[in-house]
UniProtKB/Swiss-Prot annotation:
This is Villin-2. The gene is VLN2. InterPro entries: ADF-H/Gelsolin-like_dom_sf, Gelsolin-like_dom, Villin/Gelsolin, Villin_headpiece, Villin_headpiece_dom_sf. GO terms for molecular function: actin filament binding; mRNA binding. The modification Phosphoserine is found at S890.
Amino acid sequence: MSTKVLDPAFQGAGQKPGTEIWRIENFEAVPVPKSEHGKFYMGDTYIVLQTTQNKGGAYLFDIHFWIGKDTSQDEAGTAAVKTVELDAVLGGRAVQHREIQGHESDKFLSYFKPCIIPLEGGVASGFKTVEEEVFETRLYTCKGKRAIRLKQVPFARSSLNHDDVFILDTEEKIYQFNGANSNIQERAKALEVVQYLKDKYHEGTCDVAIVDDGKLDTESDSGAFWVLFGGFAPIGRKVANDDDIVPESTPPKLYCITDGKMEPIDGDLSKSMLENTKCYLLDCGAEIYIWVGRVTQVDERKAASQSAEEFLASENRPKATHVTRVIQGYESHSFKSNFDSWPSGSATPGNEEGRGKVAALLKQQGVGLKGIAKSAPVNEDIPPLLESGGKLEVWYVNGKVKTPLPKEDIGKLYSGDCYLVLYTYHSGERKDEYFLSCWFGKKSIPEDQDTAIRLANTMSNSLKGRPVQGRIYEGKEPPQFVALFQPMVVLKGGLSSGYKSSMGESESTDETYTPESIALVQVSGTGVHNNKAVQVETVATSLNSYECFLLQSGTSMFLWHGNQSTHEQLELATKVAEFLKPGITLKHAKEGTESSTFWFALGGKQNFTSKKASSETIRDPHLFSFAFNRGKFQVEEIYNFAQDDLLTEDIYFLDTHAEVFVWVGQCVEPKEKQTVFEIGQKYIDLAGSLEGLHPKVPIYKINEGNEPCFFTTYFSWDATKAIVQGNSFQKKASLLFGTHHVVEDKSNGGNQGLRQRAEALAALNSAFNSSSNRPAYSSQDRLNESHDGPRQRAEALAALSSAFNSSSSSTKSPPPPRPVGTSQASQRAAAVAALSQVLVAENKKSPDTSPTRRSTSSNPADDIPLTEAKDEEEASEVAGLEAKEEEEVSPAADETEAKQETEEQGDSEIQPSGATFTYEQLRAKSENPVTGIDFKRREAYLSEEEFQSVFGIEKEAFNNLPRWKQDLLKKKFDLF
């Protein structure tokens, strides 16, 4: 590649961790200043370079080229070419991603948290400056429970629906509208966008309001929200468009790209199919990968990218299909997960391989090679350890019970046994914290391992599930476990009856350590976090010049220290000797000065190694969520993760390669909580086949709110976030805007309530009588007319809310009124129905039987939407109410009270339905959910037999339960 090919704009790119952006202007790459990062114009194309430095010190590169929806084809093509040039500057080892506006990858969006907001215009059409811009009210849809995708939609009622979350950004206030069927986690993420808009465009001073879809007990915020849309009226169903088409994942299909043609490759996918002289296309449906052999030429790589574009066009794939190009040796986890296994090579491809010409060229241009060269050794850091001074208790499994270890033996762990270790400590000013571990010796029998797990679960349950539970295997002990013992010594043999029986059955020699036996103990630790000693074979070949050893022979004990051993190791060896044989006098033997007695005890002098033991590969931590797709266990990586990515309804895996943490949210289903270790083992098996994760890696179960320091060290942890209660939306609302946005107190005094009710009735009469003689308007007419009528109606609804909500807590709610069109008549009927509801509810309420007012819930099932129908009888009732609207309102309400109460009692009853579905289809978290049903009445679609099987009672008995108790049962069985 000649010097002319490399764009000067890329000089110095990728020299330090961070984000660099270039915009394509007149077919040239122009750097974007950091102050403009995150601002993308729809008419332009951008190149984004993300440079990260792993724990080993090497640099990793991701190049994204972002294509705005209004950009020209020529600019998009220029970006693709420039991406190849930038990759050449970086040594040809970057992962490349194509990003389409509105369908960006999670990884790309993770660089610009909480979101990007594409702006109109571009280089060709000109940019609007801040001074030129007049504040414009904007309506957005907000999608995604992890990476947020924000899209501006027309500011009109027709844009709203029951399934999505919307943000209305006005000059004075920002509203978040939660569709009745919207996802709790999407609501929570939308709050982050609201805060971002408030800080960025309102200088952090505007008000924020949360409006829940379908709530008649509206407050002034909701009233003001609907006024902006011309007044309250039913909203329609969601209408799908091209942007909503999500490509389906399909079984991966591999093609070899040769001379621009794609040849399918049959058979099970394996790493051995990929040749380093060729390019391949892996079609996974929702994502297309281009795999590039590390010795392919630049022209071949360009041709492969072009072939992928032609393939997408010929297959008529949705715009949301992602295209990612990976280079051999730097494959992403998502790419490797499509193969049955991905055996680890002897080494990562050499950084120098195939780079001679490129390196020389870069040197001519003054571009350094920092991050490409091999990294320098990393100094060992002491990881976070648990607070010292706690209470340590240890038991070993003996048969079906646990036997406590005497205090003087705590720290001696036998390879043939299993142990339970409970450490109780204080962290700051909090109450007791617990670290409960099972330790499995290499020679322990399966029965003892199962017993240890059972006993640990029993202990955890007795402590109300608060302990951090760990399963730790001999030889893979983590620092925080080793640090509990001062010192820790792993000895041969075992004390348990199970081990003794297994030795007898196999007729094997029992090598159990005793103070009188001949034993050689290796001491290699240097600090409190690795002060572990291990009994090894009593032969001279076990020695190592970089370590210390204790040789026990009868009443004598030698301390042998290699020429390369440290003073810290010598001190630790002395401590271990005192632990094993208190009061023993040590005989020192330095390497090269050993006595004949020493060699005799070892069985004779032999050669031994003088090489330092290699340490495990240091890896960066990765966070994953998981799902079962068609019965197959799959994980999805969360990039640039933070504490806020841990959603309380989910389970996550934090993989550091040395340990695996399974984090369990408070709102996870109880059944899933019981299988956490089994799910974690599935992840370990998967990561073992793809990333070489050791099958005996330590694994922990960590419940939300009980995170230990050795977990939180991987996050910028805020303890206040961890103690907030509620679902994801409630937690986020409390943290960002205070608890008043989640828990509302609407209590009113008696006299004040009478006055407010009178004012509400007057407002209602005024709002409706003023327009009773006018013909019904269409939705568009109401949007175009003056806001006087809608404002009156909004004020009336707000007055009703203030007057009645504080005292209208009843055990049941009336059915949702049937929509009768978008005319003013339907609006009047809804308001009259609302008035009747609150009057009846107040009359029914008594201090003894009224349930405590719940906090304003973000669960759609807590609030009945306005637009759902019940039956034809209700429609006729609405017509009757409309006919009486010229009369005095309170008598009308009184006349309907008896009928309203009857309906209220029947609301929660399960209505007969022609269609029934299975329980698995109706569950809220179903993998194969049913569509086209009333999601607030999922239980109504169960057959009589399956209803009894799930709830344990008949439908009639269920109907007679109070509404709150029905809701509890529905939540319990995931039908809420």
